[in-house]
């Protein structure tokens, strides 16, 4: 068993199932992060790892989850696909997974990613499993029973080596846009809940919560005005149509998480967004709630 949050992209639970393990879904709070207490509540003698996700760019609770898991001698693997740039993360986990999908804060031209670790042994194993199980420096001599061909190709690596030089500026741009949302939407606190302002956030996305069940009507209103809001990962993991989801008989244990998710919307935020474009989004929200 591997403990995962119930609101992540399907790749999180798929990675667990790909190695023959079972994902155990954990509740979230309004930060959209797995609650640390869920590790103690859900862990059993079968628990082999905890896999928290830094969803939408927020990495709240990772250090607390790591402390709890370490006491129980359970490894922590952090899905930081949306959280590139938080350097302290690596000290709070055994493995850290990154994505360089073109839609991420730093993206290649296609599909690529990386695994980070402070453990030389885990690094050695990762390199072997990523290249057919071959021993390092000994092509066609297998050191593992199995492996994948999942090395980053040269084109993606070359692209990322250039984009890294622009990452800090892009990260500052995202922080500026997030700060402007917080400042210029603060007067709507009776209508929307803004994400917590923290330096432990890369602002991959900007999620808000609607206080009065107006998500669908705001979504439609904004679209009429030419502003595209979104709901990323609209179906929670335990609500799918696959056998793993339909096997969850105690849906009431997720009622609080479902309530939070049902109020979620994402505002536009990306590296190339101009302040004028952001002002239009802010104006649309004020027009709706006036």
Question: Which residue stretches match the model-derived regions?
Answer:
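Active-site phosphate-binding strand-loop segment of PLP-dependent enzymes
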Residues: 30-108, 114-116, 121, 266
């Amino acid at each position: 068993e591997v403990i995962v949050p119930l609101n992540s992209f399907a790749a999180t639970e798929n990675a667990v199932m790909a190695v023959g393990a079972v994902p155990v879904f954990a509740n979230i709070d309004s930060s959209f992060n797995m609650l640390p207490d869920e590790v103690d509540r859900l862990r059993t003698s079968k628990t082999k790892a905890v896999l928290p996700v830094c969803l939408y760019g927020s990495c709240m609770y990772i250090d607390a989850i790591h402390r709890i898991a370490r006491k129980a001698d359970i490894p922590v693997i952090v899905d930081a696909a949306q959280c590139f740039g938080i350097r302290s993360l690596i000290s709070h986990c055994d493995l850290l997974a990154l994505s360089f999908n073109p839609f991420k804060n730093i993206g290649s031209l296609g599909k690529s990613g990386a695994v980070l670790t402070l453990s030389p042994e885990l690094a050695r194993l990762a390199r072997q499993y990523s290249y057919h199980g071959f021993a390092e420096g000994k092509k066609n001599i297998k050191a593992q029973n199995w492996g994948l061909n999942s090395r980053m190709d040269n084109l993606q690596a070359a692209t990322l080596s250039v984009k890294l030089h622009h990452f800090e500026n892009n990260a500052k741009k995202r922080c500026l846009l997030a700060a402007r949302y917080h400042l210029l939407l603060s007067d709507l606190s009776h209508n929307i809940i803004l994400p917590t302002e923290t330096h432990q956030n890369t602002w991959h996305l900007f999620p808000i919560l609607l206080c009065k069940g107006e998500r669908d009507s705001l979504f439609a209103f904004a679209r009429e005005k030419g502003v595209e809001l979104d709901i990323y990962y609209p179906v929670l993991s335990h609500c799918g149509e696959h056998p793993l989801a339909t096997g969850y008989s105690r849906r009431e244990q997720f009622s609080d998480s479902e309530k939070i998710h049902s109020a979620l919307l994402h505002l536009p935020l990306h590296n190339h967004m101009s302040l004028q474009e952001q002002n239009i989004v802010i104006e649309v929200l004020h027009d709706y709630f006036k």
